[in-house]
Structures are given as structure tokens and as C-alpha cells.
């Protein structure tokens, strides 16, 4: 179908988002066309602001508009415990359950030789620095329960064990092959309380 250039450009832009195919992108583009101009300008500004105003915390790697992030700055949290997750979305999922009160470390990925992602491509070096510089007693490996997540957890556990820090893994109540961000609060809560030492 031939659309005017601005609509085609908007459809192509929407299709860059995950899970958005041509039909959905077309529906969204025409919805934008029907929106009030102020709403469209606000929407466009929100998109630009996300890229311009957010960064990654220099301590833990979580998304933030301040550095360090609000979690790293919160001295009421348990400073002796770090929960390692693959993505910032996983921090948000963990925080929703309101049970875990420690710190986080975001890897921004998982080891995946098939995709050419090795340990040096994820946020492991800064984790090791934190473990040396901070008084951490327990490291909770909350990577996804799939091949990449398990490989990443085992790799980190092998690096950390000689340091003498307790290394635990979330209890399996999480489905194998699933992503942490899609788990409900009850499942996550049971997984964190039933974590096992590696």
C-alpha cells in the first residue's frame, strides 16, 4: 500500500519497536494522525526526553535520571547484598514485589556464544570491582532461567566463590526458559526467599 511519506516514515519508525509488525505500526500511525497536536508533541517530547535525560547508574547499571540511582543512594537498603540481574526491566520486576531490600547490579545482557556475546560484553568487570570495594556478604544471581542465564550465573559464581562471598541463585519456581520481567510478584517472592547457595 502506498502511503504519504510522513505516514510511511512513522510506520517504519513504529516497526523498529519489538513486537510491532506492519499492521500494528499502521494502526498506531493512523491513531497518531487522529490525536490532538498537543498530545502528539507531548508524545514526541517524551520519546526524546527518555533518550536525553536517562542514563545508566555508574554504580549498578540501572536506568536513572540521577547518578548514582535512587536505589544505590538509599542507605536504608541492605548494603551487604547484591542481586545480579540481566536487564533494567528485571530490577523493576524485583522492586514490584517489595520484598528484596538489598542492592542490584545490572549486567545488560547474558553470555551467549551463539550470539557472539562473551563475558567481556556484559557488565561483569564493574561487578567484580564492587565486590572488592564494598562490604558485600551475599551475591544473589537472578539471571533468567534459560541456557544463557544459567551459563552467566555459573560463570559469575566461579569468579566470585574464591573471594569468599556467599553466592546464591533464585529458587526455581521461575519457569525454565522464561524471563524474570514476566514473572508475577508471588513467584518472584518465593524465588527470592527460597534461593539456594551455589
From Swiss-Prot:
SMART domains linked to this entry: TOPRIM
Keyword Kinase found: no
Superkingdom to which the source organism belongs: Bacteria
Pfam families cross-referenced by the UniProt entry: RecR_C (PF21175), RecR_HhH (PF21176), RecR_ZnF (PF02132), Toprim_4 (PF13662)
UniProt keyword terms in alphabetical order: DNA damage, DNA recombination, DNA repair, Metal-binding, Zinc, Zinc-finger
Residue ranges of domain Toprim in the record: 80-175
InterPro entries given in the database record: DNA_Rcmb_RecR, Rcmb_RecR, Rcmb_RecR_Znf, TOPRIM_dom, TOPRIM_RecR
GO function terms (MF aspect): DNA binding; zinc ion binding
Residue ranges covered by zinc fingers (C4-type): 57-72
Keyword Secreted included in the entry's annotation: no
GO annotation terms (biological process): DNA recombination; DNA repair
Family membership noted in the UniProt record: Belongs to the RecR family.
Chain's role: May play a role in DNA repair. It seems to be involved in an RecBC-independent recombinational process of DNA repair. It may act with RecF and RecO.
NCBIfam families tied to this protein: recR
Name by which UniProt lists this protein: Recombination protein RecR
Lineage, uppermost ranks: Bacteria, Bacillati, Bacillota, Bacilli, Bacillales
Gene (UniProt): recR
Amino acid at each position: 500500500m502506498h502511503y504519504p511519506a510522513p505516514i510511511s516514515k512513522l510506520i517504519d519508525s513504529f516497526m523498529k519497536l519489538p513486537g510491532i509488525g506492519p499492521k500494528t505500526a499502521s494502526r498506531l500511525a493512523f491513531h497518531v494522525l487522529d490525536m490532538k497536536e498537543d498530545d502528539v508533541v507531548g508524545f514526541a517530547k517524551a520519546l526524546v526526553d527518555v533518550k536525553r535525560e536517562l542514563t545508566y547508574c555508574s554504580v549498578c547499571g540501572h536506568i536513572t535520571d540521577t547518578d548514582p540511582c535512587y536505589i544505590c543512594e538509599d542507605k536504608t537498603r541492605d548494603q551487604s547484598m547484591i542481586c545480579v540481574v540481566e536487564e533494567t526491566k528485571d530490577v523493576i520486576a524485583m522492586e514490584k514485589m517489595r520484598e528484596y531490600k538489598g542492592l542490584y547490579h545490572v549486567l545488560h545482557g547474558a553470555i551467549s556464544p551463539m550470539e557472539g556475546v562473551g563475558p567481556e560484553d556484559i557488565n561483569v568487570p564493574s561487578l567484580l570491582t564492587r565486590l572488592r570495594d564494598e562490604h558485600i556478604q551475599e551475591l544473589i544471581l537472578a539471571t533468567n532461567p534459560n541456557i544463557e542465564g544459567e551459563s552467566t550465573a555459573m560463570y559469575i559464581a566461579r569468579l566470585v566463590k574464591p573471594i569468599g562471598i556467599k553466592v546464591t541463585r533464585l529458587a526455581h519456581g521461575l519457569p525454565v526458559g522464561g524471563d524474570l520481567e514476566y514473572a508475577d510478584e508471588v513467584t518472584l517472592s518465593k524465588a527470592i526467599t527460597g534461593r539456594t547457595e551455589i
